[in-house]
Amino acid sequence: MAEDINAEEYPTEIHDYLTTFEKSLTSVDEMLKTMMSVSRSELLQKLEPLEQAKLDLVSAYTLNSMFWVYLATQGINPKEHPVKQELERIRTYMNKVKEIADKKKASKLDKGAASRFVRNALWEPNPENGQTPAKAKKRKMN
């Protein structure tokens, strides 16, 4: 794309930007081809529900982002287009899914271990046998 146009037809400052843009488009095209080579139902069967939600959200966000870029290339301000609200809505759901994933990763309380820890931390010597924790642990070697 950028190589086909003479450098005299556009300012030289944007040549690097055009080259980077072309590489990005090629990368996106390759990724989409890879993603579309597998059927959606086949892909969803391999994923857990949370991963399915993530895939759906990323797909929707990608399509809307590409439409945003298309609008920008056509001279339309995407900030004034309904696609902006759609991207914000998708971001909201992405944050909700992230919260759910974070809750799943959060450490859980082991009630049995916690009760043993508290019980042993609050141990008091039995006044009847006069043992202290240090004396109770010592063993005689005969």
Curated annotation (Swiss-Prot):
It is found in: Nucleus; Cytoplasm; Nucleus, Nucleolus. Keywords: Cytoplasm, DNA-binding, Nucleus, RNA-binding, rRNA processing. The gene is C1D. It holds the Pfam family Sas10_Utp3. Belongs to the C1D family. Transmembrane segments: none annotated. Residues 120-142 are annotated as: Disordered. Plays a role in the recruitment of the exosome to pre-rRNA to mediate the 3'-5' end processing of the 5.8S rRNA. Monomer and homodimer. Associates with the RNA exosome complex. This is Nuclear nucleic acid-binding protein C1D. One of its GO terms (biological process) is regulation of gene expression. Residues 1-100 are annotated as: Required for transcriptional repression. InterPro entries: Exosome-assoc_fac/DNA_repair, Sas10/Utp3/C1D. One of its GO terms (molecular function) is RNA binding. It comes from the Eukaryota. GO terms for cellular component: cytoplasm; exosome (RNase complex); nucleolus.
